[in-house]
Each structure stands twice: as structure tokens, then as C-alpha cells.
Amino acid sequence: FDSSFTGDDRLRVRLQAAEGNFLTPFGGLANAGDTGDNFEVEVDDFYYSFPLGSRIDITVAATGLQGDDWVTSTIVPYDGAGVADASGPAFYDAGGSSSNGAGAGISFALTDNFVIDAGYTAGYEGAGDPAVGIFAANTQSYIAQLSFLSDGFLDAAFAYMHNDNSIAWQGGNPGATDTFAGLVNLDFGNFFVAGYGAWQDFDGGDDFNWTAGVGFNDLFLEGSQFGVYGGQLPQYVGNDRNPWLVEGYYQIPFNEFLTITPAIIYGDANFTDGTDDDTFYGAIRATFSF
């Protein structure tokens, strides 16, 4: 639910109900989650954003924002179009907060093409407890990203992130994670080539993860997108090596209200226990907009 007081601001309250997930060794499906048995409804997003002059936007969140939620663009066109959560650059989740807590962010358009974004998230539990507060929460993260957005051939960005969630990485050591990442998209009109690479340093080791993809816009149908991307995902606890995933998808707009996206996904989770983790998946997503 979006509402506005001035026409330039936004108050968003997003409710979500979900049960189970899919592709959990690879981050699940995009925008999926588990709110418990019987499709319990929870507040997934609750934030307010407003402009400060002509070049600055401020966002204050009670819950729901972390990682790439604070940036103007994630650069790669297959983020959001793909069905798997890995379609979004995975370093944003791996380097962000372990949960979507309270936080604040700023977006500053330095010029018409250069934008710098910064955001801070205090993960639950703690952020929602007045006795603890957002600056004393157990898990905290912050991000800064400089983006070049052109409306033309080249879009690119460099991001730095820091969090207190080293325990999620292979080895399970408590401590911090520092992330350095680059993203790029080359737009040839209706054809694009894009990808990202991220080096993440945690307590006890480091990790390099990446994806790359190609795609066609308006293939056979106006407003459609066909794409294939794949790469090496972050190596968390329980993985012997970095998981691999490849997805092919075709986003089809049936009308102004309905978009259908079928996808074929191949993943190799590389579990430490040696179980069968090399699998093909099929998925289809329906998106209704009103």
C-alpha cells in the first residue's frame, strides 16, 4: 500500500503471506519467504521516503530494508526479471543485515548521471526493542554505492558494505564481513550484457562470487525480456565449495495487469555432506499489478 502526503513522498506498507520456499540452497525464489503455517500475514516493508531539495532523497524504515534496498540501481537488468533470488547480485544479501530491521538511507544525485547511495540497517532482534535501540542491535550493516547511470550504452557501480555477520560464512566464525563489489551493464539497444563481481572478506577467510548474463528486450513481444545468467554464489556454512546456478527465463507481459515468467534453473549446491545437490528446476511466476 503506497500513500503520499505531498505527491513527491511515499509511505509504503507492504504485507506478505507465504509458506515454504524453493531453491533454498541458492537463496530461494525472488521475493519469496516463509511467514509460518497457514499463510500468516506479516508487515514485510514499512518505510517513508521524501525528497530534500532537487537532488537528495531520504528514506527512514521501521522494517524491511537492507542491502540493495538502499541503492538507486543494482545495474544488472536480470535483477527482478529472473525468478530465482540469485538474479539479484547475491553480495547485497551476504554483505547486508541478517534480518530486515530498522534503518535509514540517503540518495544524492551528484550530477544527472552520478548517484551516491548510503544506508544503515540494524537487524532484529534489538532494533525493535526500545531498551536496545538501532545502534546497539546484535547485527548491523551499512552500505555505500557510487553509480553511473547513463540512459545509454554503459551503466556501472562500485559498492562497499560492512556487517557483523561473519558467522554465516564457511567456518562459522563470529565477526565482521567487508564487501567490495563492481557491477556493469552494456546496453546495445534491445540486447544487453551485464554482470557483477564481489570480494567478501570475513573472519576466517574470504570469498569471491559473481554472475554474468545476456538478454534480449522486446523479443517477439513488446515489453518482454528473455535472459540467461549464471555464476558462482557465496559460500555459506554447509557448502563445501561455492554453489553454482544458471537460470534462463522469459518475462511475458500478457496485459497491463498480468506478467508471466517461466524459468528453467540448474543448480549445484556443493553441500559438505555429499548429498545429491546437482539438480534442474522448473518454475513459473505470475505477477499481478493494479
Regions found by a protein language model. Give the residues of each.
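Internal helix-turn-beta structural module
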Residues: 243-280
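Outer-membrane beta-barrel "beta-signal"
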Residues: 278-290
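Outer membrane beta-barrel
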Residues: 1-125, 147-151, 211-235
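Flexible loop/turn segments at secondary-structure boundaries
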Residues: 20-22, 67-68, 125-126, 165-167, ...
